Amino acid sequence: MPEPSISDLSFTSFVTNDDNLFEETFNFYTKLGFHATRSYVKDNRSDFELTGISTDSIKEIWLESFPLSEVVEASGGRELRKPLQESVGYESEALLGYSPYQSGGVVIKLRLSNHDLEKNNDLPGEVTFFTASIDKLKAKLIEIGAEIIPSKIDLVEFSTRDPMGDVISFSSYPSLNSKKITSPDFFLHPKKEVRSEESIVEQVKSEEGKKKIAIITSGGDAPGMNAAVRAVTRAGIFYGCKVYACYEGYTGLVKGGDMLKELQWQDVRGLLSIGGTIIGTARCKEFRERWGRLQACYNMVSNGIDALVVCGGDGSLTGADLFRKEWPELIKELLGEDKITKEQYETHRNLTIVGLVGSIDNDMCGTDSTIGAYSSLERIIELVDYIDATAASHSRAFVVEVMGRHCGWLGLMSGIATGADYIFIPERPPSESNWKDDLKKVCLRHREKGRRKTTVIVAEGAIDDQLNPITSEEVKDVLVEIGLDTRITRLGHVQRGGAPCAFDRFLATVQGVDAVRAVLESTPAIPSPVISILENKIVRQPLVESVAQTKTVSAAIEAKDFDKALQLRDQEFATSYENFLSVSKYDDGSYLVPESSRLNIAIIHVGAPTSALNPATRVATLNSLAKGHRVFAIRNGFAGLIRHGAVRELNWIDVEDWHNTGGSEIGTNRSLPSDDMGTVAYYFQQYKFDGLIIIGGFEAFTALYELDAARAQYPIFNIPMCCLPATVSNNVPGTEYSLGSDTCLNTLSGYCDAVKQSASASRRRTFVVEVQGGYSGYLASYAGLITGALAVYTPENPINLQTVQEDIELLTRTYEEDDGKNRSGKIFIHNEKASKVYTTDLIAAIIGEAGKGRFESRTAVPGHVQQGKSPSSIDRVNACRLAIKCCNFIEDANFQVKHNANLSADERHLRFFYDDGVKTSAVSGKSSVIDDNTSVVIGIQGSEVTFTPVKQLWENETHHKWRKGKNVHWEQLNIVSDLLSGRLSIRTT
């Protein structure tokens, strides 16, 4: 049967004014396998029948060659066509004909016209059709006496003429860019397609010509390295490469043999939750010598490897780049010594190097984060939280020493996240002459305010401004001098241990996949790249430049140019240091603003509880108190304000230990101000609020919009108001990150690790894990990526029967390949709102039924456990960053009003004035108070902090029914997850 035109026409018309020729042509095409789907006669018509009919037609017959799609065997040996949506490779109706396993069909319109027609026999009409049975079609044409015209075009087999004289050509190529198809089984039975001997030979040749990549983990180990090994291995296999593990770092390259081993898909299963690196790491002295690199070159060429993905610190990456520079000389030397053949020399004369930065210190320039850094930070805050309990019990001081010989990132971030009193980091060394006195003042002041514990963080590379080391013992002695019972805790290599946190699993995975792409896209002219993350985007930076800039930091410190050293760190480092000072040191009264500029700032929690509400409230309070502002907590949400006027002023001692406290200390619920807007306005006026920070999820976003919309009726709402998104669902428009979502992901990763362990122990059990998120698939997509789920179901990607069938096929295949081995636990991630039909229980039941004893299924619903207990390090650090930004926003907006000499006292209070009868904002000077951009949602877009007017978000970027933003910024996570689980391979094959 002829199939769709490779000329990309949706239909073609053949016209005649001869009734007999019209019938003859109709019979010709029906003999070729076309079917009549519509007929029209002018004398018998209705308005409906005129749709698509030419005005000059007396008769029309529409002939169609139906799309070829998969068939299945039914009872009695009959074959039934599968629904197109369930066929192999189906994408959508819009893409029909572009999928390799479906064709779009074609329509021929035969028209009998009432006009005189002149046929140009020298330039006849011509169209080309695809057929998967070219020989059968040719035989059929000969049988009916049609003319066979040899073709002069490569893609066209032959042509013929229909009774109207139009040239009809036939091809075995579905499109101009596709491969030749000579069997209908390609469409009807995709799994039964018969492979020719030529295709088998081609495959063998392609096996020999596959790119071979080696993955190395070198230098100090870091949590997340195993995730990188898994990602590089599976992405390499997916893209048609062979991937080798180089064991024990560069030692494996030098020694070769069994220390260079090819990795298969199943070799890297279950690695996401394992800390360290299973392929080992070591510092190799031999590789530092030229003879060692020569031997490494020989071992690589002998195995056909000419690409290296190196995961390590700046030393490991420097060695890799040197190896690439020397490679042409090394391989030429091997050829001269007859250790390799001329063919090997020509094939592998260029080496490709791609770097992944694995370092807990986060000391590499050109990237916002390195693999392992946040896991190490997570370990530090977990241990310091434990220390806090005993320190408070005994009213002790603890000096905690953390890693960071040349970089103070761990020291700075752990200081913020643990509520430390003081930190020592190399980029901001204290004065040699007075650091001891300064330390005493800060710690004594905090004690006088009622604090029972003292925490001082010391980076192992801490120095004073004269480059003298500051040791933990020295710090202890200073604290003992002021009468504090002091202990020293050196965390040491505990910081490297344990399972990687959610962010490091994500980072190592997406960077590992991009590393393989970088290898395949590399040319000898492209400098060796290092895969980095900047502004929340995966980018490639020149390896040499990144390493050189990193070494510049150490040089700047040695030259006592500490400002330059600080600038060379990532863009948030200096800001974070200032944030730490604002909540720990600036409470000494040195940063008080004039009384006329002091504000009353209200904070309210709205929506479901998350683990980061308290840390954000703590920072906003401490930062504001340090400047002389008053901070009021609205207790129990808007319901508490409306019913009881529940407002409480917060003091320093009230919030100082909220840095590691989950839930909400001031209470939260889903009530909205619209429940009684007048009462809300009354209490705002009573307490003379100058600004409002609403911390919460979609309800907080809605509350801000309602307050903004009520400004025309209640002038008190003209105060600057800011919504700080805090929800596990991460569904607030205007931001790519919400406080609490990282804690939730860490909780989910631990939960799923435990579930997978149970599944692995049972050998033949699969768990379907239901996660929260509402109609936002962010949580499910992210969790699926970091837990290695076989399949992820989200509201953004509707589930159908074909999807479930593919996933069960993948599950069955995976069980067959695992053969009951360890680390073979399998999970599916299902968003709670992914489908009304394909629920978590139904998916589990379908899996269990499909298993037929080979495997079984269970459901696992973590429920509100996902909210987490203690906030994660990322949530604590970002709570500090965003809360201070909110305070600054409120201060700036008030400054413009309170210091405007042209406004009267009443106009300053109302925050608007009338200009020639037009109501005008005192903040923006615009003619509409509602549009003065002082009701905003703070968000993180990439790495940039943004303030977006709530009205703009509500009207343009919000799905109100689904309670989320329109921007699905996490879609790429699903693609990477499907690639590494094998799901994408099922769909492409």
Curated annotation (Swiss-Prot):
Active site at 361 (proton acceptor)
Write out the ranges of the annotated region (N-terminal catalytic PFK domain 1). 1-585
Q: What PROSITE patterns has UniProt attached to this entry?
A: PHOSPHOFRUCTOKINASE
Compartments, as annotated in UniProt: Cytoplasm
User: How would you summarize its activity regulation?
Assistant: Allosterically activated by ADP, AMP, or fructose 2,6-bisphosphate, and allosterically inhibited by ATP or citrate.
Question: Highest taxon of the source?
Answer: Eukaryota
Q: Which InterPro entries match?
A: 6-Pfructokinase_euk (IPR009161), ATP_PFK (IPR022953), Pfk_N (IPR040712), Phosphofructokinase_CS (IPR015912), Phosphofructokinase_dom (IPR000023), PKF_sf (IPR035966)
* Binding annotation for beta-D-fructose 2,6-bisphosphate 1: 670, 727-731, 772-774, 832, 864-867, 963
- Return the annotated region ranges for C-terminal regulatory PFK domain 2: 600-989
Q: Which Gene3D superfamilies match?
A: 3.10.180.90, 3.40.50.450, Phosphofructokinase domain
GO CC terms of this entry: 6-phosphofructokinase complex; mitochondrion
Sites binding ATP sit at 220, 283-284, 313-316
Q: Which cofactor does it need?
A: Mg(2+)
Q: Which UniProt keywords apply?
A: Allosteric enzyme, ATP-binding, Cytoplasm, Glycolysis, Kinase, Magnesium, Metal-binding, Nucleotide-binding, Transferase
- Region spans: Interdomain linker: 586-599
EC number(s): the record gives 2.7.1.11
Q: Which Pfam families match?
A: PFK, Pfk_N
Summarize where beta-D-fructose 6-phosphate 2 binds, as residue positions. Answer: 396, 487
Q: Pathway of this protein?
A: Carbohydrate degradation; glycolysis; D-glyceraldehyde 3-phosphate and glycerone phosphate from D-glucose: step 3/4
Chief location: cytoplasm
Where, by residue number, does beta-D-fructose 6-phosphate 1 bind?
359-361, 403-405, 460, 493-496
As for family, the record states:
Belongs to the phosphofructokinase type A (PFKA) family. ATP-dependent PFK group I subfamily. Eukaryotic two domain clade 'E' sub-subfamily.
Job of this protein: Catalyzes the phosphorylation of D-fructose 6-phosphate to fructose 1,6-bisphosphate by ATP, the first committing step of glycolysis.
User: How does the annotation summarize its subunit structure?
Assistant: Heterododecamer of 4 alpha, 4 beta and 4 gamma chains.
Identify this protein by name: ATP-dependent 6-phosphofructokinase subunit alpha
Which organism is this protein's natural source? Komagataella pastoris
